[in-house]
Each structure stands twice: as C-alpha cells, then as structure tokens.
C-alpha cells in the first residue's frame, strides 16, 4: 500500500515549485473559474506556515486587504496554481509565524529580509 501511495504521488508531484520558507513574501497566480470563464487571480502575502510533505504539502499565506487580514491555505500540488514567484526572502526564527496575526498595520507584514547569495 505504501508503494502505491508513493507511485501516485510521484506521478502527480509538481516539480517546478520554488523553495518557500516561512517569512517569505510570495505572489501566487491562481486559476479562478466563474461560470464558464476562467481567469487568473493574484494572491500576494507572507508565508506564515508550511505543513505536510509530498503530495499533501500546504502553505498558509497571509495578507492584509483593506485593513482586514486574509489567510489562504494553498495545496502545493493544486492544479489551480498557475505560477508562484518569491518576491522577498524573509528571515524567520520560527517555523510557524502565527504571532503575525496579532499585529496590526505595517507590523503585521514585517519580517526581516534574508540576504541571498547569487547563484551562478
């Protein structure tokens, strides 16, 4: 049974997903179907947690929209994800950044920036 699960996950795995860690600011283009039309909707926010592994991996992205905090749990292997770009790499000392929920204003999205070495 375990081999069957691994086989199914290997065939359905998304390979072009960038490395994302809590604290990173990401922009995700999601396919939204409204009636017969299909359009792309951008969701940009801070990754406050990642959970699971393999085909069950999800990330929780939080943004502030018109003064209201909005969180979205996004499955990494979802066919509705068109593209994912990392806008900024954040430096977090925790695996889960749930303390950002209690903050208001600019402090709600403030995470130190991680300096990345350029890869050649």
Swiss-Prot record:
InterPro entries named among the record's database cross-references: Ribosomal_bL19, Ribosomal_bL19_CS, Ribosomal_bL19_sf, Translation_prot_SH3-like_sf
Coiled coil start-end: none
PROSITE patterns hit by this protein: RIBOSOMAL_L19
UniProt keyword list: Ribonucleoprotein, Ribosomal protein
Source species, domain of life: Bacteria
Known role: This protein is located at the 30S-50S ribosomal subunit interface and may play a role in the structure and function of the aminoacyl-tRNA binding site.
UniProt similarity note: Belongs to the bacterial ribosomal protein bL19 family.
SUPFAM superfamilies, per database record: Translation proteins SH3-like domain (SSF50104)
Record protein name field: Large ribosomal subunit protein bL19
NCBIfam families found in the cross-reference section: rplS_bact
GO CC, one annotated term: cytosolic large ribosomal subunit
Matching Pfam families: Ribosomal_L19
GO biological processes: translation
Keyword Ribonucleoprotein (UniProt): yes
Organism: Pelodictyon phaeoclathratiforme (strain DSM 5477 / BU-1)
Lineage, top ranks: Bacteria, Pseudomonadati, Chlorobiota, Chlorobiia, Chlorobiales
Zinc in keyword set: no
Molecular function terms from GO: structural constituent of ribosome
Signal sequence region: none
């Amino acid at each position: 049974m375990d081999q069957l699960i691994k086989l199914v996950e290997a065939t359905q795995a998304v390979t072009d997903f960038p490395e994302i860690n809590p604290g990173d600011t990401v922009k995700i283009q999601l396919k939204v179907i409204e009636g017969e039309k299909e359009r792309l909707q951008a969701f940009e926010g801070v990754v406050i947690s990642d959970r699971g592994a393999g085909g069950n991996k999800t990330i929780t992205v939080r943004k502030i929209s018109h003064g209201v905090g909005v969180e979205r749990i996004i499955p990494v292997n979802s066919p509705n994800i068109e593209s994912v770009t990392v806008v900024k790499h954040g430096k977090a000392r925790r695996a889960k950044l749930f303390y950002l929920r209690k903050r208001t204003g600019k402090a709600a999205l403030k995470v130190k920036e991680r300096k990345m070495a350029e890869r050649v």
